């Protein structure tokens, strides 16, 4: 039996809902013999990572998958890399707005996802749901968490694997926002469930085209 911790943020930036939180609430508690535990985290500098750290310590998952909203994206975006910088375009939910600050002074400049990102992307698209590999998780709390969890694993939770997936707005979030893409909660749920199934079943990622020119 393997265990995965799946995190989702609370609403931020004036939104009333966050699709990341909505989708994790709908996840099953098990896939086969493997366990899924969900965790709501605040869209807040430092506190988000601290909450995950406590849960890793108590739950001892094999994998940690964090989900975040990326308004404006057209598909499910499986993130490749997290960078050691906080440069918040907007304030977080407690008014913090660090600019050009390192997340951890003793951390590497960047950490790569240790999840099978291309196998995840391939299987999601095979099921008729748009998905791609993303090479930037931004510089807001999503990247903060992606980097922070990878840092914690490198420093104190050796052997665990983690990564991050961004998802689009839900249709109800784009009312009055002309030409802004969205995805149904059903399709997001299918995509994230597939991602978890692949995380449980694929040890080594596949090799396939997934890069970008710029």
Swiss-Prot record:
UniProt-listed InterPro entries: Peptidase_C15, Peptidase_C15-like, Peptidase_C15-like_sf, PGP-I_bact-type, PGPEP1_Cys_AS, PGPEP1_Glu_AS
Gene Ontology cellular component terms for the protein in this record: cytosol
Chief place of localization: cytoplasm
Any GO MF annotation of the entry: pyroglutamyl-peptidase activity
Species in which this protein is naturally found: Fusobacterium nucleatum subsp. nucleatum (strain ATCC 25586 / DSM 15643 / BCRC 10681 / CIP 101130 / JCM 8532 / KCTC 2640 / LMG 13131 / VPI 4355)
Subcellular location(s) per record: Cytoplasm
GO terms of biological process kind: proteolysis
Signal peptide residue numbers: none
EC number: 3.4.19.3
Organism domain of life: Bacteria
The entry's keywords: Cytoplasm, Hydrolase, Protease, Thiol protease
Record note on quaternary structure: Homotetramer.
CDD domains hit by this protein: Peptidase_C15
Active site: 79, 142, 166
Protein name: Pyrrolidone-carboxylate peptidase
Protein role: Removes 5-oxoproline from various penultimate amino acid residues except L-proline.
Enzyme class, spelled out: hydrolase
A Pfam family this chain is assigned to: Peptidase_C15
Entry's family note: Belongs to the peptidase C15 family.
NCBIfam families with a match to the protein in the record: PRK13197.1, pyro_pdase
Reactions performed catalytically: Release of an N-terminal pyroglutamyl group from a polypeptide, the second amino acid generally not being Pro
């Amino acid at each position: 039996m393997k265990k995965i911790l799946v995190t989702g943020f609370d609403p931020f930036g004036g939104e009333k809902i966050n699709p990341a939180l909505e989708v994790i609430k709908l996840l099953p508690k098990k896939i086969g013999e493997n366990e899924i535990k969900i965790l709501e985290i605040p869209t807040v500098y430092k506190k988000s990572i601290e909450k995950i750290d406590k849960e890793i310590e108590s739950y001892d998952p094999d994998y940690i998958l964090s989900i975040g909203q990326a308004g404006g994206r057209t598909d499910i975006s499986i993130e490749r890399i997290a960078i050691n910088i906080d440069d918040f375009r907007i304030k977080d939910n407690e008014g913090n707005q660090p600019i050009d600050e390192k997340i951890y002074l003793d951390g590497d400049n960047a950490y790569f996802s240790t999840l099978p990102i291309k196998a995840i992307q391939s299987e999601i698209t095979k099921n008729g749901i748009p998905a791609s590999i993303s090479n930037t998780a931004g510089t807001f709390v999503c990247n903060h968490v992606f980097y922070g969890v990878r840092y914690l694993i490198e420093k104190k939770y050796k052997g665990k694997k983690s990564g991050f997936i961004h998802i689009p707005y839900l249709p109800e979030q784009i009312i009055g926002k002309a030409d802004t893409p969205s995805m149904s909660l059903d399709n997001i749920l299918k995509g994230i469930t597939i991602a978890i199934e692949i995380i449980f079943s694929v040890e080594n990622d596949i090799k396939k085209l997934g890069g970008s020119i710029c």
